[in-house]
Amino acid sequence: LELKNAWTGQNAKYHGQKQYKNDRDITQPLLQFGRCLVHMAVDTDEVYMTTKLAGKNTFFLPFNKGNNHGQGNPPNTGTMGEGGHKTSYLWQEVFTKESLANIIQHFVRLDGSSKDDLNKRTLFFPRYHQLSVVRNLVNHAATYGVGQTYLIQHSAGSGKSNSITWAAYQLIETYPISADIPGSKGIEQPLFDTVIVVTDRRLLDKQLRENIKEFSEVKNIVAPAFKSSELKSALENGKKIIITTIQKFPFIIDGIGDLS
């Protein structure tokens, strides 16, 4: 972490990032790519993150909660209205032991093969909105069971594919907190047999298929389904994640009806 504060006339967006880009020796072992999960520039109002230090070419992304459908963070009124730093969620929520363990287990991923040049690989660390939406979705499903409807809004370039991918993988491993909730087969059985990802464009379908397959650490659990026979085959063969397009959705419905 590179910590800055307004009382010394510095902030994370300019001074924190500038220090990482210009003043840090990226040949030091700790700062070399792959040694740290994430680097963050933090002040009392905003947080920025990167997973790869590359000198002046280092690219930072916001790790903020957003404020009134815009950038930044909302005012922190505190639990008793006493106020606090806008970025307190970072240490109060994200950096707890339970949260970090969850991030390492379910979110962080180094793509590519161990045979590939390390500098050509990509280290994925979730942005705040991705972390929040996947956790909220999984926790709500585990609490209230199947049959729920959700609306998740992502702006262009905000990582929809990764959010969908993380959600899909975690939903197939979601267990109900109670045997009494809808869809539960007992607290020792996953709540969902299969997750079906439906996209509205063929290009996005291809991107998602590649993204989901790349994230998979277990072979043969992901399958495309372009017609009902493929869906039937995928379900019968125990595929955990099935990907298709909205144009093929009527076939999906027919296939599910036939299986039931």
Language model regions located:
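Conserved helicase motor
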Residues: 202, 222-232, 246-251
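Short beta-strand-centered segment that lines the nucleotide-binding/catalytic pocket of NTP-utilizing
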Residues: 197-199
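ATP-dependent helicase/translocase motor core
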Residues: 2-194, 203, 207-218, 237, ...
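Short alpha-helical segments and helix-capping/turn motifs at coil-helix boundaries
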Residues: 21-27, 226-230, 254
